[in-house]
Amino acid sequence: MMSGQELAEVVQIAVEDLHSDHHPVELENHEVTEEDLSPTLKRQRIEINCQDPSIKSFLFSINQTICLRLDSIESKLQVLEATCKSLEEKLDLIMNKQPNPIQVPMVAGSPLGATQTWNKVRCVVPQTTVILNNERQSTSVTKLEAHEESINRTTETLENMLNSAVPGRRHNTIVVKVPAPEDSHNDDDNDSGSEASDTLSNCGNSSSNMGNNVTLITLNSEEDYPNGTWLGDEHNAEMRVRCPITAADMLHISTNCRTAEKMALTLLDYLFHREIQAVSNLSGQGKHGKKQLDPLMIYGIRCHLFNKFRITESDWYRIKQSIDSKCRTAWRRKQRGQSLTVKSFSRRTPSSSSYTTTEGVQNTVSSSSDLQQTSPQALHYALANAQQVQIHQIGEDGQVQVGHLHIAQVPQGEQVQITQDSEGNLQIHQVHVGQDGQVLQGAQLIAVASADPTTGVVDGSPLQANDIQVQYVQLAPVAESSATAQAVEPLQTALQPEMHIEHGAIQIQ
């Protein structure tokens, strides 16, 4: 028989078996305490006890590389942030910058004041923009709508200015943008610098607020010089200029000029007489009050050199310096009273007209058919009222006396022309010109002068040693006392030893 203790153990075991598959019953208000929760299993701690130094150094190098890479990324981000700020400042500057006003277009007229016409040079190309000098290119930014609107406003301003300046103009104008004039170099005469050589002078009606870095050039067409040739690429309407140089002369230039600089200086002599070079330069600036060489012809020379020799902007800069130097040389020869005649032109093919310049204006002087029949015309000069020609008179003792041949008063509808034939002889004519610029009557020969007394012939009589020698045209105003109202009377004789006229219309001082 079991004892009481054994019976209690059997009952306890039976009770545990009955409740082994059932969860303990929890009352509704029962609170779970920490004691009721079963303890969580702890993760076994694994200790890594590695004493290998190579692994430690490898891990250290990886850590160091990652840190350096992060520092590099941080520095690049700082540089990028600074660049963004700089671009924002430049963009704000561009958006707030007011566009420079455009200069008025140039008009044609006589450089010596004889004929003041207002006919613009004809052009056959559409409106486009031509960059003469490559400007420094800044960092390109995205085009914004506001910037495009400012460009449109500038274009509208240009159109309005052109319409107001030249009524009835053709819509075929080349907009030439050139850099603003900078400080010129210190040279012998301090007349011009190549930095400002491409800057085109104001022509026509200009206002005080106009900028100096933009002007207009109207290209001409083939019908302006039917017997002439093209400077530049004749197949590119934007890179060509029609000039009065004949095909034979152009072939001669292309054959003999092996370098770009020599061709530029040769074309300069064909397009501008030495007398014009002496009183002009590329910029039209300087202490001597020089005029500007015709920008249209200078642009034609540039196009010709770029087409023939594929020159660069640095080459063109050097060539411009040579052109300015050539003009200064002619000016010094003029001051010393030396001859300005180009010897190589004595036997070249004469042309019917030539380019001269005053403030970048084209001049083409018409000549009569009678004048063309008497002698071939190579160069034309026209004198108006209050103009004079400086001459050298060679006396019997061989001494040279400097004087001035004054045109005291030219009657209305008349003008005086100085022409030079292919032999280098200078002839002074009086012509009658109508209001439309056409020659009404044949030109009357007033005087003939030559650098070589043996070559000049007047009505079969050679020039004598005491005859005058016309050196160059001087664009200096005549005193009002000498500008009388008397008309220039034609001379019956072609040349007089003393060039004395009774009425004082033409006199030597």
From Swiss-Prot:
It comes from the Eukaryota. Residues 238-334 form the BEN domain. SMART domains: BEN (SM01025). Residues 178-207, 339-370 are annotated as: Disordered. The keyword Transport does not apply. Pfam families: BEN (PF10523). It is found in: Nucleus. InterPro entries: BANP, BEN_domain. One of its GO terms (cellular component) is nucleus. GO terms for biological process: chromatin organization; negative regulation of protein catabolic process; protein localization to nucleus. Signal peptide: none annotated. Residues 347-358 have a biased composition (Low complexity). Residues 359-370 have a biased composition (Polar residues). PROSITE patterns: BEN. Keywords: Cell cycle, Chromatin regulator, Coiled coil, DNA-binding, Nucleus, Repressor, Transcription, Transcription regulation. GO terms for molecular function: DNA binding. Residues 68-98 form a coiled coil. Belongs to the BANP/SMAR1 family. DNA-binding protein which may repress cyclin D1 transcription by recruiting HDAC1 to its promoter, thereby diminishing H3K9ac, H3S10ph and H4K8ac levels. Promotes TP53 activation, which causes cell cycle arrest. This is Protein BANP. It comes from Xenopus laevis.
